[in-house]
A protein has these predicted regions:
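Noncatalytic alpha-helical scaffold of FAD-dependent oxidoreductases
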Residues: 1-336
Length: 336
């Protein structure tokens, strides 16, 4: 059956800056509002999670807000121009009620500009060799928040595991014979290196132990993590002591940083001219490990509950593929 498109179309772009748990119910609210509308219909609704927003290089429309946590694009149509305009404005109000902003495009050119970011979703795999494991998970829209939470749990665990893999590789490197540049001298390597290798190894091992504990205690109150590890914990001032470490991670109030916790301190330890080859070796290990990181990204077509769940991978990295397949098993259990 071919349907004639209504005469008037408005494209609404909604940017959400609060938590994903706060933002996702807006999808159901928009759907229900337009399903009940007498003369306006929802012709298209697309959802991008924050990983897609970052990957496509999304240019935020709201001034001074930073990168949104979620973006929705909606086409609303009607033969009644006043009705479609009012509906688009109401959708913007729904977004603002959930820590978001709404923007309306009227002309075909402006509408096309709004949709450009959606056409670049293949960029999610730009850090790999453009290979992805794709899953179409169909869930009730009312459960999207719960599903997103589950995916975020998987992503947080994958992120910490990748950092632990890096720590293990660095420990192995630092435990071996380090490449000291003797700068044309006859001094023994041990004398030139001093205690720097031991200090570096002890530092990496301490960070690894902290992240091991964190991975095993994601449901523990943040206060316990802070009490145990003090100033080494990267928690935002607005983080709540009684929330779980997972919740703080999910809502961007807690982070673990390879740059701040590992690579920067190692660069300070190995800061001498004799250490350039050591730093080069550390950098290669870091780059190789980061290349193998696995994450799950979500976007959704049409607001119909068909959630495209994508895992970018390098097809030549067997370990990365195995990690991705284990994640798929968890995703399938979550969906069921």
């Amino acid at each position: 059956v071919l349907h004639k498109m209504p005469k008037y179309t408005r494209t609404v772009c909604m940017e959400f800056f609060g938590t994903v748990a706060t933002a996702t119910p807006s999808i159901v609210e928009i759907r229900d509002f337009l399903l009940a509308h007498d003369s306006v219909r929802l012709a298209g609704l697309e959802h991008l999670d924050w990983r897609y927003v970052r990957a496509v290089g999304y240019a935020t429309k709201a001034a001074g807000k930073g990168r949104p946590k979620m973006v929705l694009l909606a086409d609303v149509v009607s033969d009644d121009e006043a009705a479609v305009e009012a509906a688009a404005e109401h959708i913007c109000e729904l977004a603002r009620a959930r820590d978001g902003e709404g923007f309306i495009a009227v002309s075909p050119e402006a509408r096309k500009t709004f949709w450009l970011d959606r056409s670049r979703t293949a960029a999610i795999a730009k850090h790999t060799n453009a290979f992805k494991i794709n899953e179409d998970v169909v869930i009730p829209l009312e459960r999207l928040g719960e599903y997103s939470d589950g995916i975020e749990r998987i992503n947080i665990e994958l992120s910490i595991q990748n950092k632990l893999t890096l720590c293990a590789a660095l420990e192995q490197y630092l435990s071996g014979k380090l490449p000291i540049d003797k700068m044309g001298t006859d001094l023994p390597t041990a004398e030139l290196l001093g205690e720097r290798g031991k200090h570096a190894l002890a530092h990496v091992s301490a960070v690894k132990a902290r992240w091991d504990w964190l991975l095993a205690h994601l449901d523990t109150p943040l206060a316990d993590y802070k009490a145990r590890y003090g100033a080494t914990v990267h928690a935002a001032p607005k983080a709540k002591d009684d929330e779980s470490c997972f919740t703080a991670f999910r809502d961007f109030r807690l982070r673990v940083s390879v740059k701040e916790d590992v690579m920067k301190p190692l660069a300070e330890i190995f800061s001498g001219k004799t250490d350039t080859k050591i730093i080069e070796g550390l950098g290669k290990i870091h780059a190789k490990t980061v290349r193998g990181r696995v994450f799950v990204a979500l976007h959704m077509h049409a607001g119909d509950g068909n959630v495209h769940t994508n895992i970018p991978v390098n097809s030549d990295d067997a370990q990365m593929l195995q990690t991705a397949y284990r994640s798929v098993e968890r995703i399938m259990k979550l969906a069921r």
